[in-house]
Each structure stands twice: as structure tokens, then as C-alpha cells.
Amino acid sequence: MTLIKIGKIVNTHGIKGELRLLSKFPYKDKVFINNMKIYIDKKDIEVINTYRKHKNFDMITLVGYNNINDVLKYKGLNVYVNKDDIMLDNNKYLDEDIIGSNVIYKGISVGEIKDIERYDKYSLLVILGKKEYLIPYNDNLVDKIDISNKKVYIKDIDGLFDI
């Protein structure tokens, strides 16, 4: 079983056991769903009862917990899901599947994806080659992703990389 981090419990909310999460996970609609099994601190297995957005936070309640005192123990802990439980649409990939991939530009390897930086409106691929490159992670620049061969093909846009 491979656990994927989807966020961190930063606080409680109210007195009925609601948890406030900070998450940059890109496919929240696939993990913050009723009856989704989550792993808190990679140990405690719980099940999501409800989910809602509140300001910049993701709010969840857990099955069997309806009091703040029952969930205080989870404050400050990371939340994970089993990778096999995430049902992504076609041509959607987890960051963990892309990180470490070789980047191909104009038929030449220009580096390896070291990280994906997620922001509210966009994401950046962090590519380490001759130097560090930051390029937008979107369909305008990424031509194809080959997960099985760990390769990401970038569209032929002049001046994007020093080759």
C-alpha cells in the first residue's frame, strides 16, 4: 500500500468534532468524499463523514466523532490516503507519479522533475538539468506524459530551455 499525503490537520472547528485541513492536493473531489478511508499520521485509520470548503481550508468530519474532545488528538498531524483508492480521470496524474520523470524537449533530455509547486491558480514543474527551470504545468506546455517510462514531453517552444 502506498500512502499519498493529501493535507495536514491544522485545527478543529466548532465543538462538534469538525477538523480544519490545509491541503494543496490537486484532486480534492476524488479524496474528500463520504466514506473515503484516510490515514492520520500514517497510523490511525478513519473514515470521512462530511466535507466542505471554508475560506482557504478543507473541513471534514469523521465517522463516529461528534465532539471536539474526540478529535483534538489529531491536531497538527498529516492526512494520507491509499493511492489505490484515488480514482483519477484519464490524463490526470498524481505528483508522485510525475516527480523523478525525465523531461524531453525537442527530442533531448533537459533534466528531471524534482518537484511540483502548487499555487491557487497554477502549478509549476521544478526541473533540474544544466540549471533549475521552473515552467508552468499545463496543457499549453506539456505535450505528453508517459508514466510507465517516467518521461514528460514538453512542446517545442523556442527559448524554453538552454539546449
Q: Predicted regions span which residues?
A:
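Short Lys/Arg-rich amphipathic alpha-helical segments
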Residues: M1-I163
